[in-house]
Structures are given as C-alpha cells and as structure tokens.
From Swiss-Prot:
InterPro entries: EIF3B (IPR011400), eIF3B_RRM (IPR034363), Nucleotide-bd_a/b_plait_sf (IPR012677), RBD_domain_sf (IPR035979), RRM_dom (IPR000504), TIF_beta_prop-like (IPR013979), WD40/YVTN_repeat-like_dom_sf (IPR015943). Residues 124-413 are annotated as: Sufficient for interaction with EIF3E. Residues 170-274 are annotated as: Sufficient for interaction with EIF3J. Residues 134-144 have a biased composition (Basic and acidic residues). It comes from Homo sapiens. This is Eukaryotic translation initiation factor 3 subunit B. The modification N-acetylmethionine is found at M1. It comes from the Eukaryota. Residues 1-158 are annotated as: Disordered. The gene is EIF3B. Keywords: Acetylation, Cytoplasm, Initiation factor, Phosphoprotein, Protein biosynthesis, Repeat, RNA-binding, WD repeat. Its main location: cytoplasm. PROSITE patterns: RRM. Residues 185-268 form the RRM domain.
Amino acid sequence: MQDAENVAVPEAAEERAEPGQQQPAAEPPPAEGLLRPAGPGAPEAAGTEASSEEVGIAEAGPESEVRTEPAAEAEAASGPSESPSPPAAEELPGSHAEPPVPAQGEAPGEQARDERSDSRAQAVSEDAGGNEGRAAEAEPRALENGDADEPSFSDPEDFVDDVSEEELLGDVLKDRPQEADGIDSVIVVDNVPQVGPDRLEKLKNVIHKIFSKFGKITNDFYPEEDGKTKGYIFLEYASPAHAVDAVKNADGYKLDKQHTFRVNLFTDFDKYMTISDEWDIPEKQPFKDLGNLRYWLEEAECRDQYSVIFESGDRTSIFWNDVKDPVSIEERARWTETYVRWSPKGTYLATFHQRGIALWGGEKFKQIQRFSHQGVQLIDFSPCERYLVTFSPLMDTQDDPQAIIIWDILTGHKKRGFHCESSAHWPIFKWSHDGKFFARMTLDTLSIYETPSMGLLDKKSLKISGIKDFSWSPGGNIIAFWVPEDKDIPARVTLMQLPTRQEIRVRNLFNVVDCKLHWQKNGDYLCVKVDRTPKGTQGVVTNFEIFRMREKQVPVDVVEMKETIIAFAWEPNGSKFAVLHGEAPRISVSFYHVKNNGKIELIKMFDKQQANTIFWSPQGQFVVLAGLRSMNGALAFVDTSDCTVMNIAEHYMASDVEWDPTGRYVVTSVSWWSHKVDNAYWLWTFQGRLLQKNNKDRFCQLLWRPRPPTLLSQEQIKQIKKDLKKYSKIFEQKDRLSQSKASKELVERRRTMMEDFRKYRKMAQELYMEQKNERLELRGGVDTDELDSNVDDWEEETIEFFVTEEIIPLGNQE
C-alpha cells in the first residue's frame, strides 16, 4: 500500500504543475495555512508528495488534481459525523488505487476489492522500478531544457504537527452542534415587585412587554410564598442567544425608583457554585513610578513645548519654544508611523503604529501605556484624559465589535467595543465637558452612554426622527441637536439637559436647508448657523441664531446675512464673534459683540480681505485672518479691542496656523502633506512680528503642547491683571537679561580660555628655564636662547625694493 501511495500523489502533483495551474509556494500564506486541515490528512499528503520526486512518474489524468473544499475541511475537523470524510491519497480517482484494507467487521466485498488493489499497487511499483533508470537518463536532458524537478515541500520524518484544530478552525468549530439540556435558554430576574394574585396578571404583562423585545418567551414561572410572589422570576426563551441578549441589555433596567432588575443566566448558578472556597491572595503589583507627567509646567521661563514631524514622517522632535532658536528636548527616528497627537491637557503624546497606539510622557518621554488595535487610524481623548477612543477600518465581527474601542488610559484595559457605519464622521463619539457622558448619532437615534459603566444612560437611546447633528456644551452637560423639516412640521433646534433629559429650549425654524452648531469655548453662547431659502426669493440666506445660555429661558437673538458665509468663529474667552462673508475678490470680515442687554452690535467690518479661515488667540482679543493654500498664505493680525490691523504679512502657500496655549505666539507652516516644496514653519508674535524661519526637510506637522486649566480662581486672575504693571517690570528685566545672555556667555567663555592659556604659558616658561643647563651642555656652551648671544654667526643681507611714485590729482584743476 505504501508503494501505491508513492505513485498516486505524484500524478496529482505534476498535474498541478501544468502551465496555467497554480504553482506550489515555498511557504503558504497565513490564510492558506488556516484552511489547511489538521490531523493525519495533511502530513500524509506531504509525505506522498516527497515520494513523487524519487519515483519520477509523470503520467496523470486531469482528474488526478485534488481540491479540498472548505466545507469538507470543516467536517473533517469537527470530528466523526454521518457525512463521508475527505478522500485520502489512496482514494484519488486518478491513482488507480482502491481504499485501504477495511478493519475487522467490514463487508467481505470490500476485502476483495482490497486484494485487487494490492496486486495493482505491486504492478505499478515494479513498473516504477523499471522506469527509475530511464528517469535517471532523462535527468540531464531535463536540466538542459530547463525542465527541472519540483523542489520538495514535504515535512521531515520527525515532524510533529502540534497545531490544534481549535487554532486552525476555531471559527468553524464554534458553530458545531453541542448538547443542550434546555436550561441555556432560561434567565433569572431579581428585584421584581412582590405582588398578590390581584396584581399578578398586570405584573406579567409588564414583564412580558419588557423582555419580549429580546426574543420569543416560551415559558415563565413566578414563585410564590404566603400569597405573594418572591421577588424573582424565571423566563425561558426559544433560543439561548435570546437569553444572552436579554441578560446583556436588561440587566440593570430601572423599572421604578424601588426596583432595578438584575438579570442572570440560569446556567450561571452552576458556575458560581463551583467556585473554590479557598481564596488565593492576588499577587501585589509593584507601583510603577511614571515621574512628574506635568514637569513642563514648572519650567522657570514658562516656555511652551511643541512637536514637529519632518523628513516625510521619519523623524519626530519635541522642542522648547524660545524667542531666539527652538531648543530640542527629544528627537527620535520613526517615533510614529503617521502622525502624533497631544492629549487635551498635554499629559500624553500619542503615536500611531500599525498594531496600535502608544502614549508617552514624563521628562524623558518614556512609554506610559500602549493599546493594541490593528490598523488604527484615528483617535480621540476624553476631556478628562481618562479614556481613549480608537478607530480602525478593518472588518469586525458581529459578536465582537472591533471598529471602535474605548480604553481606560490608567489601566490600559478595553472598556467596550462598537461597530462603525461607513457613512459616519469622526469623531463618532462626542464627549461631555467633564467626560462623564459620551454620545453617538445613528439613523433616527441619539445614544448617550455614561462612564465608567459604558452603558446606555437609563438603558435606552433617544428616538429622534431625522436627527442630523448634535453637539455638547463645553460648559455643562447640555446637548444641542437639530432636526430638519418634515412636511408641515418645521425644523427645530433643541437644547436638552442631562442626565434628566429635560428639554430646556426648543427653537422652530422654517425653510431650512442646513444647520451648523457653534459653541463658545466656555459654553456661554450657542450660535446656530441656519441656511434657508425664504419663500418668494432666490438664493440662500443665512441666519445666525444666538442662544444666550446663562440667562433665564435661554433667549435667542438673530443676525441675518444675505452673502455667502465662508467662516464663523467665536472669541474663546469673550462675547465677540467673527464672520468671513462674500466671494473672492470681495471678501469681508465682520466682528460682532453680544451685549448684556441682548443686542448684537456690529463692531467693525474690513473689506477686501484675502482670507478663508479665522484663528482666534486662545486668550481672546487677538485674531489672525489667514488665506490658506489657494490664497497663497496671506495673513492679517487684528486686535479686536479697538479693531485695528496690527500687521499684514504673507507666508507663501501656508497650509496651517497654530496658536500657542498662552496666546503670545503663533506658528504658520507649509506642510509636506499638502505642498511638496518650501516646507517650513515660521514663528510670529501675536502682533505679527516675524521671529523665526525654521526650514525642515519635508516638514509635515507642528502641534503645540496644551496646558491644563489654571488652578487660579477668577478673583485671583482679576487681581493679577490689576497688578500687571508690577509684574511687567520683572518680565522686562528678564527680557533684557535674556537678550544680553548670549553676549555674556561668549565673553565669559573667552575670558576662561585666556586664563587657561596664561596658566599653561607660565608652566611652560618655568619648564623652559629648568632645562637651560641641559641645552648649554648639548650645544657646547653656546647660549642660543638669545638672538645676540653669538654675533660671529650672523649674516647680513641687503634687500632693495623698487618704489614707484604716482601722483593722482584730486578735484577739478583749472
């Protein structure tokens, strides 16, 4: 039978080597390896393929090729079943061999067929021996023609396949039939109201209404004692999957103030009953000292840091911002694979890698935490820096969502995974100002989750038909969303207080095309930019609906503009906003002020501006109007306290503008990602005075390191502003010292060098005088230390220089 095997498989192997057929690979790809059936079938095929090269028979019919279907592999891996197993090498149609000898108890007819099979195998084996010499003679001719034998891909004789079926076919084995005793579909619900017979039917209706959402309920049982229910019930579903879904979604359901359901699977009781009574003391984890993660805030000169990516992303550096030249803190090659991002308070630096995200911090920027998420592309931090949201476009499964994952930054543990719709916009989850809530919008639904449980608020989502967009207030747990018109129902903007879900303001709007929500940084105001088409008119008119959030009943003021709106931006710490409107080349910028009496006043309008973006200083008052990319980098620095243009400049082809956290400096840059030449970043003062031009090879990105909110109260800040003149004298003195610091260091260095030279010269002179007697002895008593010590040895030479005299008249001579 072994000889039969050595003949059968080579025919199939050489059939696969025909032109147009798939050639065998040296090492199969991982996907093919996963589909390779485990057990005796795989090593057996490998062994017979090795023998094909030894025999050298090249006659096989087209039917000898072997293909193992995935379904057959699954059946083979799943163990014994009624369906036949995949054919072995002896059963191949083109091998001229019958199945192996049956075991005891098989049909006699099959034994007869086996005897015929043995005789045929012996004949073929003898024929193979006769052909061995002919194959050896044909080998040189085959090498000359380039027809060499295929390489051997067989496993060695001592090879042991230690890969289990679960590793290879885990996804298939997961769905194989399993024995069930029926209790997998039963759940136990605790904290159910205890009622008597008169209210039992009503309770059953309520329970059925709640739990029938998860599947068909086939049976229920309400235990009673002393004429009342015991406070727990049993429900049986038609499928175990429905029971699992009920536990997942109904556990913690709040029926009323006194009753919150606790739902468990009935099978959980066995699991908890088998817990060992012996408690193993957990191993104490050593404390990992990460150092001072906010050390940069204690810098004596109060300088800020920023990150720079250059050389097309191959190098990343961290710098101190210095007026003269940036001071490098850390520089690493291939620190990130795409880009970097700072956390909201500047504690962590996030770098992107194919396998996940890494967080860095501390004085030496050591790795603080890492999160494994294959193919991650986008991230988002919670405002409190406690949670990290990562997104990967790789496919995820229905049972285990992996597209979006929320992580606990402190522990590094995964909190929850979510699916992601392809039409969503990042960030998909938007956080409340304190990180206690986060929300996402799907079709006709607004889902609000709470931390740290990561579950739905009140265990249910908000059904909002047609919801288009939403946004959290930066100053409180208030969420704003808008809904478009639906037939005769007007569009509306709604402000909702959370977690109570109370609607504190609703604004109806008509003839609406689109809405954009713009919050002021402190949450004092909300501007809803409404594009609408009034009846009887052509074109689009824009209304700015200003909600004054700090006043009773949230009054709304309206500013209407008939020109095209290019950009809108609130002053971060104030009540002014700026609007870019018009069309090139007639672009104007208007500055408005929201007064306490509710009146919105136009402060100033500048015409003929080359700008398409508005960048407010983080501290307010100052603003940069920038014409990025297509507008060739035109810059205008404006002081909105008196609405004066402090300076007009240009950074050709600028693609980005970044204010530092203090509002003292601003950076304009040309990124290699958007423009392939003139890549650099320039540092300006808030007044528009250029300080530095830093050219970096293939510069990509610059990001300032954020600062956490100040610990000072508003009263303390007011007092500091009142005493600013006293502090300004100290700052001016430090500035003068810093300006002369470089010259002082140079003078001090030169003075030190001169002093060292004088010491060395004195030491050399002393040594020279000590060696004078030795010199006299070596030179026969002749003193050569002085030039006039031996006049007889002098030679006098006279050198003449020819000097010509030329007279050049100066001025006019009459």
